[in-house]
Amino acid sequence: MAEEFPRLNALDVAPEISLLDQDSNTFKLSELLGQKVIAYFYPAAGSPGCTKEAADFQDSLEDFKKLGFSVVGISPDDVPRIKSFQEAHELEFTLLSDPDFIAHKAFGAFGEKTLYGRKFRGALRSTVIIDEKGQVIDALYSVSSTGHTKALLKLLS
């Protein structure tokens, strides 16, 4: 039987992660204590759905900032790919590389999915909202790449 990775719930403590960002700098979630964070997990930089989702986060970035949130995108892509993705789409938020799915698994954003009729295990499009104390406000799993940021803004307003 495949290993299961539990999903997070409100009031859980967000797991500590240490990953490389788009500039090859080490990013630790604990360094954002005192700030509210939206950590969104996406399967593949440059794919149509992930590009749309990233563009929507960028278009809504000022609204999230007004609500006191930073945005961090996390994918299994390597650093050069997320750097290229960030530059190509002029993304003004941090992207993190998680090629071994360490953060994905810790946040419950990894599991079985179906693509073109084929089942496999990989990144699940998910969003975890974290308060300034490092506690989960909400965790949303298997979200849609379109319309997600609008729904998120409505939830947080």
What do the predicted segments below correspond to?
Residues M1-S157:
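Chalcogenol-based redox active-site neighborhoods
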